[in-house]
Swiss-Prot record:
It comes from Nitrosospira multiformis (strain ATCC 25196 / NCIMB 11849 / C 71). It comes from the Bacteria. [4Fe-4S] cluster 1 binds at C63, C66, C69, C112. Keywords: 4Fe-4S, Cell inner membrane, Cell membrane, Iron, Iron-sulfur, Membrane, Metal-binding, NAD, Quinone, Repeat, Translocase, Ubiquinone. Its main location: membrane. NDH-1 shuttles electrons from NADH, via FMN and iron-sulfur (Fe-S) centers, to quinones in the respiratory chain. The immediate electron acceptor for the enzyme in this species is believed to be ubiquinone. Couples the redox reaction to proton translocation (for every two electrons transferred, four hydrogen ions are translocated across the cytoplasmic membrane), and thus conserves the redox energy in a proton gradient. Binds 2 [4Fe-4S] clusters per subunit. This is NADH-quinone oxidoreductase subunit I 2. Its EC number is 7.1.1.-. The keyword Cell inner membrane applies.
Length: 162
């Protein structure tokens, strides 16, 4: 009996008809189109865009040069050099992120013990030359300073899940 059913399903192209019905149903459904530069879709607080380095409220940079983000980066996009300061703490002298290599996975953000490196909601950035997409420590700190309010809001919204 099952052989007969299988024969008719195969002979009558049941799967093909089922697929054509699905296509026909969606062909006449309302289209959803977002005209991107003019219209923007809502973003999640967890959106992974352009990187930023944060500072403490007293103005000191948060990065303690533990190099966990450099070690965990699967694309090897982060380069860190550090020095010992006179007070015994370690701070970065060089912190570069090559955005041409970065895959925006967020591992650097997750591994940071002091919430220094974060990924912002910024997705519109460009470079005219390859070197323009290598962000230095000063550039990352400038992004962090400029968007600190939004970063703090996003971190607060996500705090319950961390």
């Amino acid at each position: 009996m099952n052989r007969i059913k299988d024969f008719f399903r195969t002979f009558l192209l049941f799967e093909l008809i089922k697929g054509m019905m699905l296509t026909g149903r969606n062909m006449f459904a309302r289209k959803i189109t977002v005209y991107f530069p003019e219209e923007k879709t809502p973003q999640s607080p967890r959106f992974r865009g352009l990187h930023a380095l944060r500072r403490y409220p007293n103005g000191e940079e948060r990065c303690i040069a533990c190099k966990l983000c450099e070690a965990v980066c699967p694309a090897l996009a982060i380069t860190i050099e550090s020095e010992q300061r006179e007070d015994g703490t370690r701070r970065t002298t060089r912190y570069d992120i090559d955005l041409t290599k970065c895959i925006f996975c967020g591992f650097c953000e997750e591994s940071c013990p002091v919430d220094s490196i974060v990924e912002t909601r910024i997705l519109e950035y460009h470079g005219e030359k390859r070197g323009d997409l290598i962000y230095t420590k000063q550039m990352l700190l400038a992004v962090g300073d400029r968007y600190e309010e939004q970063i703090a809001k996003d971190r607060a919204a996500d705090a319950g899940y961390r």
